[in-house]
């Protein structure tokens, strides 16, 4: 996942900043990489820490550490992305309350609400494996296509 984040970064920067290196945010695959690692740590805490108080303290500490890491690498959504991932994980069996994972992302974009119905439909079971890597290749490809389309339109209008 981190390899896809690194490969996608120059094209992401080109699309957002019109240069190969971007001074501001990194692409969302960095957020996803950090979030996956965070969920691994949260799962270990869940299975290893029997005492509820200790588990909660470790959950909070994990969220703070990964939030700081997201801030340090300037991942997209910064600490809000990793916090949302943690909330989705920790509230995964809480029914409609799992939508609380959207709250941090609402600060960044109200469009996040559009995914709420999809989240409510999720059964908790892993989907088909086919096409998994398609989206990792599509992510940088769509930035490149949009950049080329923008250049073509700008040239046509000039």
Language-model segments: which ranges?
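Alpha-helical transmembrane segments and their immediate juxtamembrane cytosolic regions
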Residues: 1-158
């Amino acid at each position: 996942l981190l390899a896809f984040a690194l490969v996608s970064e120059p094209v992401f920067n080109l699309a957002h900043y019109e240069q190969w290196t971007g001074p501001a945010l990194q692409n969302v695959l960095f957020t996803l990489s950090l979030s996956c690692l965070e969920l691994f740590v949260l799962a270990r805490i869940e299975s290893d820490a029997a005492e509820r108080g200790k588990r909660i303290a470790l959950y909070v500490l994990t969220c703070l550490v990964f939030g700081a890491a997201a801030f340090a690498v300037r991942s997209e959504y910064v600490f809000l992305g990793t916090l949302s991932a943690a909330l989705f994980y920790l509230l995964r069996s809480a029914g409609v309350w799992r939508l609380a994972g959207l709250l941090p992302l609402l600060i960044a974009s109200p469009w996040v609400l559009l995914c709420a119905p999809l989240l409510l439909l999720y059964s908790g079971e892993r989907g088909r494996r086919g096409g998994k890597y398609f989206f990792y290749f599509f992510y940088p490809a769509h930035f490149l296509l949009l950049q080329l389309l923008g250049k073509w339109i700008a040239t046509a209008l000039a």
